[in-house]
């Protein structure tokens, strides 16, 4: 099973090359309707029906189809296939600009994952702001009009994080000090510059109140940013 819900619309996905048994896509990632998903199933792969009954959707989900959403998803795929390269190119420029702005204006930051390039999606950055609690930063920036969320977006009702920190080999606290920012091809550098101004002001205010930041500045705690690649950190 290949989960391509985030990658769809932001990187070429060729099932002949990838050879997945199953692949999921989310059309709202490329301006399709929300609430509809797409599942690619390789020929010969058998699935148990999600809802038993009628033979709708190849017998996998009984009930009347959501025709409007299906048509909307198909149209989104059609439109995106013609502009994918241009969309990725524009998003890459915004990504490089955003990272440069953050490294210039906010000290002690870094990104989780590879530097911008072929090994990273072009429409997002997971940014660590050392000495800051990510949820507090998210709430403060949201109030000021910036739509973002914490670096760990999938948590259960007990606020236990998902397995991403374990998979990356990075400590959980780096993720808990991060924001995940994303954008699309219609955003501008002015939009991103405004976002950085909001984040910088909020980070500064939170660090003024942070005992962790104070300990880092006084040398009583080692910086965890040393675990990130040098190319993605600011001093």
Question: Can you annotate each of these PLM segments?
Answer:
Residues 1-235:
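Pyridoxal 5′-phosphate
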């Amino acid at each position: 099973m290949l989960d391509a819900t985030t990658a769809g619309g932001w990187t070429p996905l060729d099932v002949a090359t990838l050879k997945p048994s199953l692949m999921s896509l989310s059309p709202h990632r490329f301006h399709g309707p929300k609430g509809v998903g797409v599942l690619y199933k390789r020929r010969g792969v058998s699935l148990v029906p999600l809802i038993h009954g009628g033979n709708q959707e190849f017998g996998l989900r009984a009930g009347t189809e959501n025709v409007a959403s299906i048509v909307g998803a198909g149209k989104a795929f059609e439109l995106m296939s013609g502009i994918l390269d241009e969309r990725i190119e524009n998003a890459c420029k915004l990504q490089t600009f955003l990272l440069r702005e953050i490294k210039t204006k906010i000290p002690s930051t870094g990104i989780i994952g590879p530097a911008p390039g072929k090994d990273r999606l072009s429409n997002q950055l997971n940014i660590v702001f050392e000495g800051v609690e990510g949820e507090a930063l998210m709430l403060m920036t949201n109030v000021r009009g910036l739509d973002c969320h914490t670096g760990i977006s999938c948590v259960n009702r007990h606020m236990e994080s998902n397995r991403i920190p374990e998979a990356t080999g990075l400590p959980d606290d780096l993720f808990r000090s991060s924001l995940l920012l994303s954008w699309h091809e219609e955003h501008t550098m002015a939009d991103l510059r405004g976002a950085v101004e909001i984040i910088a002001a909020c980070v500064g205010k939170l660090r003024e109140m942070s005992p962790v930041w104070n300990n880092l500045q006084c040398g009583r705690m080692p910086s965890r940013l040393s675990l990130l690649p040098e190319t993605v950190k600011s001093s």
